[in-house]
């Protein structure tokens, strides 16, 4: 059984127009990390929904209580992690407060999927916050570390994209970018 769909508290968190912060605080105090992913295509956690809905108060409670500021979605289909909370935050121009909070709490502004939050950012405030925090586009990362260009043309078979092959290439290229960033940080 899916713990996510069967847990009433997660149903409440996702469906309440304005989740009660006292309930979230109670859960945090009891060790909740909110690392339960939905079983749908997106694989989001409650925190991803809060980021998209601009609910920075609940995100702050959860992260300061021990939840991962770089929590990723989990694709059940590809069995891999993907976008962090920051991707959700920058997907809407009006969620700049969430973007600012995540950056202040240490979110990785250059996490690549292979796109980065700066590649996907909507709204001038989100873009400025990211740039001020040292964010780069995936193309800037590629050039800075002299990495090969993203080319998924080999993922086509008989004129159609093989989604499994594309997914694997996508993941490998993301890892290449993320490893380059990690290595650069370690040598600082």
Where are these regions (language model features)?
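Substrate-binding/catalytic groove segments of enzymes
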Residues: 96, 109-111
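Ankyrin-repeat-protein effector appendages
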Residues: 104-105, 119-188
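Residues marking helix boundaries in flexible regions
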Residues: 4, 10, 14, 24-25, ...
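Ankyrin-repeat boundary/"N-cap" motif
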Residues: 1-15, 36-49, 72-90, 111-120, ...
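Ankyrin-repeat intra-repeat helix-capping/turn positions
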Residues: 16-19, 54, 93-94, 125
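Ankyrin repeat domain, specifically the short helix-to-loop turn at the C-terminus of the second helix
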Residues: 1, 25-34, 60-69, 100-108, ...
């Amino acid at each position: 059984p899916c713990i996510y769909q069967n847990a009433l508290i997660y149903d409440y968190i996702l469906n309440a127009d304005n989740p009660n912060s006292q309930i979230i605080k109670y859960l945090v105090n009891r060790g909740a990390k909110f690392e339960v992913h939905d079983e749908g295509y997106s694989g989001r956690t409650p925190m991803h929904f809060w980021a998209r809905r601009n609910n920075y108060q609940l995100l702050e409670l959860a992260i300061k209580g021990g939840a991962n500021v770089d929590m990723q979605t989990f694709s059940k289909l590809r069995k891999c992690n993907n976008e962090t909370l920051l991707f959700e935050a920058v997907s809407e121009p009006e969620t700049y407060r969430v973007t600012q909070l995540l950056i202040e709490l240490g979110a990785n502004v250059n996490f690549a999927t292979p796109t980065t939050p700066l590649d996907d950012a909507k709204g001038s405030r989100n873009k400025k916050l990211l740039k001020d925090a040292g964010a780069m586009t995936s193309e800037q990362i590629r050039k800075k570390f002299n990495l090969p260009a993203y080319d998924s043309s080999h993922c086509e078979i008989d004129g159609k994209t093989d989604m499994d092959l594309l997914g694997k290439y996508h993941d490998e290229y993301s890892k290449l970018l993320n490893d380059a960033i990690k290595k650069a940080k370690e040598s600082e």
